[in-house]
Amino acid sequence: MIPNPVRAVIIDDSLLVRNIISDQIQKDSKIHVVATGKTGMDCIDLAQKMNPDVIILDVEMPVMDGLTALHELQKKKLGIPVIMLSVLTQNGAEATFKALEYGAIDFVPKPSSVFQFDPEEIGNILKSKILAYFESKIQIPSQNLLKKAPAYSKVPAGSHLKKSPIQAICIGTSTGGPRALQEVFSRIPADISLPILVVQHMPAGFTKAFATRLNDHAKIKVKEAEDGEPIEPNTGYVAPGDAHLSIQSKGGRKWIALNREAPVNGHRPSIEVLLDSAIEEYKSGIIGVIMTGMGKDGSAAIVRVREIGGSTIAQDEQTSVIYGMNRQAVEMGGVEYIEPVTEIINRIQIILKERGI
């Protein structure tokens, strides 16, 4: 059941930021700010005294920073979801990914100066993330318990469609994705012999550090995708924030193509753009994976992947921070297999044995 209202605590060392966020998110009657604080110590104290439904926590603060406070909260096993506020710097990005490893459900970037703040924008982002998180917790479709999802009506089980060998793996994810992708990439074998193209909804300024972090945990090379570079096997390519990632053929090879055209489904990069480009270039020779995240980006394209004879996988509800995009894909009939995050690579390897490379 969604708390009504959702009781929020805001922790930031700037009084102005606390007031801005408090005023903005309470414009929605479903959210009520019950307390605010300015240090990590305040965070721990208010979490225990107020037992809020959600905490909005700044990364960088005096006395005790947000990372330390988050780590302490996790040790106390209070089970309160935390959304981090992170400045758009290299240090801020690295601290943010560490916070996600510690258990934060998501993050929202903020400018380094309060004078650059767009109060309405940051308020809308926080409201949507908070409400999407709680709404996802009351949706329990029966399919999520199945390993093999129901066949899509246009592509019945045992379809006559010719399924060609797999040439690429495409993964789309949003809220909860950084931690889930780290889990997936840590399990990819060094000799996977395929390129892996990733769209993670993430602001510009964070994706390069994120790709580096994935690379540190993976046996294959992982990098932020660059426009015009050749697509190589045993390499993961992460779409840059604020750029669509697509594929183009030239001289008998596949190449990365980035563009800054209009957002699709409210996102740039968009999972839909990547999957539709992969369908055009690889036809049925793709595995499409849709993972944790709010919204519907990629769900319609996953249906098209399955229609053309590609293989499709969704992360299950139990291991998703938000069962949103993947839920949409399942309900639309676009998903062939539903797996916990720890089993996605196992399923991919089974598909590769069945279909070849």
Swiss-Prot record:
It is an enzyme of class 3 (hydrolase). Residues 7-125 form the Response regulatory domain. PROSITE patterns: CHEB, RESPONSE_REGULATORY. Residues 162-344 form the CheB-type methylesterase domain. Involved in chemotaxis. Part of a chemotaxis signal transduction system that modulates chemotaxis in response to various stimuli. Catalyzes the demethylation of specific methylglutamate residues introduced into the chemoreceptors (methyl-accepting chemotaxis proteins or MCP) by CheR. Also mediates the irreversible deamidation of specific glutamine residues to glutamic acid. It comes from Leptospira interrogans serogroup Icterohaemorrhagiae serovar Lai (strain 56601). Disulfide bonds: none annotated. Belongs to the CheB family. CDD domains: CheB_Rec, REC_CheB-like. GO terms for cellular component: cytoplasm. The modification 4-aspartylphosphate is found at residue 58. Phosphorylated by CheA. Phosphorylation of the N-terminal regulatory domain activates the methylesterase activity. GO terms for molecular function: phosphorelay response regulator activity; protein-glutamate methylesterase activity; protein-glutamine glutaminase activity. This is Protein-glutamate methylesterase/protein-glutamine glutaminase 1. SMART domains: REC (SM00448). PANTHER family: PROTEIN-GLUTAMATE METHYLESTERASE/PROTEIN-GLUTAMINE GLUTAMINASE (PTHR42872), PROTEIN-GLUTAMATE METHYLESTERASE_PROTEIN-GLUTAMINE GLUTAMINASE 1 (PTHR42872:SF3). The keyword Transferase does not apply. Its EC number is 3.1.1.61, 3.5.1.44. Keywords: Chemotaxis, Cytoplasm, Hydrolase, Phosphoprotein. Contains a C-terminal catalytic domain, and an N-terminal region which modulates catalytic activity. The active site is at 174, 201, 297. GO terms for biological process: chemotaxis. It is found in: Cytoplasm. It catalyses: [protein]-L-glutamate 5-O-methyl ester + H2O = L-glutamyl-[protein] + methanol + H(+); L-glutaminyl-[protein] + H2O = L-glutamyl-[protein] + NH4(+).
